[in-house]
């Protein structure tokens, strides 16, 4: 999400197209919502513009990180029921869904996102809570490290602003970096 001023904002493709001249703000930091007003705008954009749905007619499932604070879950539920008038809501942990997506109910899930990496042992679809671990390290940290390396070498990537440079490095990272399944062969 990009915020120009308090009354004008861009989300999604419009934000990407104008990223060189806009200030970028993410309402989620290290897996936790920090800006509820903008999260509400994002959900409105998703439900109305992207999905073209009638929220009153559909239950919603929301994924959440391992250690999502209960107060955040309650606040999000309040927004969904009171603002969007949804009939039902289900929260599920991303680690469990990641394992389900691979067709398994028992295993070990590693989920590395923008600001968090989470480790979760799962047995028959249930989290084994004594083994849960979360590290505040993710893709944004790798982007910042690559950006620092470029700055330390005197590189300037964008004539516009530092935010745009970060997005350029993020694009390079996403197109060039990968996780190998056969480390020894590489």
Q: Residue locations for each model-derived region?
A:
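Structured beta-strand/turn binding interfaces of compact recognition modules in eukaryotic regulators
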Residues: 27, 63-66, 92-94, 102, ...
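Phosphate-binding glycine-rich/basic clefts of nucleotide- and phosphate-handling proteins
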Residues: 123-186
């Amino acid at each position: 999400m990009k915020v120009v001023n308090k009354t004008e904002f861009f989300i999604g493709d419009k934000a990407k197209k104008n990223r060189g001249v806009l200030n970028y703000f993410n309402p989620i930091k290290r897996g936790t919502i920090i800006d509820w007003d903008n999260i509400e705008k994002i959900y409105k954009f998703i439900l109305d513009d992207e999905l073209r749905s009638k929220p009153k007619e559909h239950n919603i499932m929301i994924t959440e990180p391992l250690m999502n604070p209960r107060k955040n879950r309650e606040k999000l539920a309040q927004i969904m029921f009171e603002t969007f008038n949804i009939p039902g809501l289900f929260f599920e942990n991303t680690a469990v869904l990641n394992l389900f997506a691979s067709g398994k109910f028992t295993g070990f899930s590693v989920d590395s996102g923008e600001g968090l990496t989470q480790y979760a042992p799962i047995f028959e679809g249930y989290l084994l809570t004594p083994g849960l671990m979360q590290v505040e390290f993710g893709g944004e940290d790798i982007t910042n490290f690559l950006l620092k390396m470029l700055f330390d070498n005197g590189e300037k990537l964008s004539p516009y602003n530092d935010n745009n440079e970060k997005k350029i490095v993020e694009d390079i990272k996403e197109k060039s970096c990968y996780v190998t399944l056969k480390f020894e062969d590489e």
